[in-house]
UniProtKB/Swiss-Prot annotation:
Its main location: membrane. The keyword Translocase applies. ATP binds at residues 169-176. It comes from the Bacteria. It is found in: Cell membrane. The record marks 362 as: Required for activity. Its EC number is 7.1.2.2. PANTHER family: ATP SYNTHASE SUBUNIT ALPHA, MITOCHONDRIAL. This is ATP synthase subunit alpha. The gene is atpA. PROSITE patterns: ATPASE_ALPHA_BETA (PS00152). Keywords: ATP synthesis, ATP-binding, Cell membrane, CF(1), Hydrogen ion transport, Ion transport, Membrane, Nucleotide-binding, Translocase, Transport.
Length: 502
């Protein structure tokens, strides 16, 4: 083989000409302490608050404490294999999650990674998990109703698109059930749903996903899950991740319903992180900014102005109380941030009233504007009548003689309470709610035994479906009870009662 020296020199010359003098700098530091999912890193200059840091073994962390000589980080993965003295690199990015249509029907963790074994999620866009909430000018007042399908809520505590309505109560009395029923009720209503499970048992999340799949609700739902076995930082990040996924749809002009289940565990996860980072504890050992972590999350729920596409995020945060104490730190914080609360009472639940909504202290501060006129017409006196019934029922326990009008009120109250009961996973369309509440409020049920009320309701609605098929559609079209519709309703009730009481 004959190699010419000129060829070699020309190759060397080309290499020298194409050589570019470039210095690559990487801002890095070393771990000086690690444990309990917290790392202290020395030597990272100019680090941002909330910045992603790259640890060995493809694990990332988030910078939270920027101190004079070191940075306190929380790890977003296992700390196994990471030791003191390891090198940590800055990324210059904040925590982001994938967003887009590809997430619908999937179960993901707080970082948007799939948990359901259905393969990778092909999303082309990402979005920062912490973003500023829309300003005053970018918003519109709440005017459109968001139907939950639950009679007690849609009639007395109505929810509008863009509202934040708190669901609060003790453990195991149906808080999640209300949220899941609301998701099921959004079928064919063009509302995307996001269910964020924070610190729940894995079996509970699996059960919820199975229920939603059976009901066909996973076709428009994303489940973001950080279970009890996940680290505190992942539990802390999951609601913000879910909210960023929701904002993607809101900015496209769509309506989104997001459920945070529950923010009590979210606050506990944040308290854990803060105490491990040596931040000073405040009331109930929560850090001083625990109000801000919830307010900045819930303020991102909004009804956008027409200029921005008119999309909305409706948030239903859930808070767990201890022995019905709504005056504790986290419950009072979240009550003051939200636009009303649905209070569930264990006494009502154990007395067989499900959903156990306490009509006296449950309120919706803005939802009344969103309620359709027909529902306002039937539910106007409902809350007052129930309050009077509770008062009378407490008084009647002493066995004193009551006058006839009080007895009538008691009997009507019993029937109203019975009518507001509802089975789980059976949300009711608003027109059917109006029809049955109209019968209850206008004393048509006074001659029916309390024990037969649920049977009457079921059979009467079937009768209306068969013999007055267009009645429900008329109510939806007109959105109010005109004299014609009232006449038709009265006739239908009287006809059916003859058959029912025969």
């Amino acid at each position: 083989m004959n190699v010419k020296p000129e060829e070699i020199t020309s190759i060397i010359k080309k290499q020298i000409e194409s050589y570019e003098h470039k210095i690559q700098t990487v801002d890095s530091g070393t771990i000086i302490q690690i444990g309990d999912g917290i790392a202290r890193v020395y030597g990272i200059e100019d680090c941002m608050e909330g910045e992603l840091l790259e640890f060995p073994n493809d694990v990332y962390g988030m910078a939270l404490n920027l101190e004079q000589d070191n940075v306190g980080c929380v790890l977003l993965g296992p700390e196994k294999g990471i030791k003191e003295g390891d090198v940590v690199k800055r990324t210059g990015r904040v925590v982001e999650v994938p967003v887009g249509e590809a997430l619908i029907g999937r179960v993901v963790n707080a970082l948007g990674q799939p948990l359901d074994g259905k393969g990778p999620i092909k999303c082309t866009q990402t979005r920062a998990i912490e973003l500023e909430a829309p300003g005053v000018i970018e918003r519109k007042s709440v005017k459109e109703p968001l139907q939950t399908g639950i009679k007690a809520i849609d009639s007395m505590v109505p929810i509008g698109k863009g509202q934040r309505e708190l669901i609060i109560g003790d453990r195991q009395i149906g808080k999640t059930a209300i949220a899941i029923d609301t998701i099921i009720n959004q079928k064919d209503k063009n509302v995307k749903c996001i269910y964020v499970a924070i610190g729940q048992k894995q079996s509970t999340v699996a059960h919820i996903v199975n229920t939603l799949t059976e009901m066909g609700a996973m076709d428009y739902t994303i489940v973001v899950s950080s279970t009890a076995s996940d680290s505190a930082p992942l539990q802390f990040l999951s609601p913000y991740s879910g909210c960023s996924m929701a904002e993607y749809f809101m900015l496209k002009g769509e309506d989104v319903l997001i459920i945070y289940d529950d923010l009590s565990k979210h606050a506990v996860a944040y308290r854990t992180m803060s105490l491990l980072l040596r931040r000073p504890p405040g009331r109930e050992a929560y850090p001083g900014d625990v109000f801000y972590i919830h307010s900045r999350l819930l303020e991102r729920a909004a009804k956008l102005s027409d200029k921005l596409g008119g999309g909305s995020i409706t948030a239903l945060p859930i808070i767990e109380t201890l022995a019905g104490d709504v005056t504790a730190y986290i419950p009072t914080n979240v009550i003051s941030i939200t636009d009303g609360q649905i209070f569930l009472e264990s006494e009502l639940f154990y007395a067989g009233q499900k959903p156990a909504v306490n009509a006296g202290i449950s309120v919706s501060r803005v939802g009344g504007n969103a309620q359709i006129k027909a529902m306002k017409q039937v539910s106007g006196t409902l809350r007052l009548e129930l309050a009077q019934y509770r008062e009378l029922a407490a008084f009647a326990q002493f066995g004193s003689d009551l006058d006839n009008s009080s007895k009538e009120r008691l009997e009507k109250g019993k029937r109203l309470v019975e009518i507001l009961k509802q089975d789980q996973y059976k949300p009711m369309p608003v027109e059917k709610q109006i029809i049955i509440l109209y019968a209850a409020v206008n004393n048509y049920l006074s001659d029916i035994k309390v024990s037969d009320i649920r049977t009457f309701e079921r059979e009467f609605l079937e009768y209306v479906d068969t013999h007055y098929r267009d009645l429900g559609q008329k109510i939806l079209d007109k959105k109010e009870l005109t004299d014609d519709i009232k006449g038709e309703l009265n006739t239908a009730i009287q006809e059916f009662k003859k058959v029912f009481l025969a």
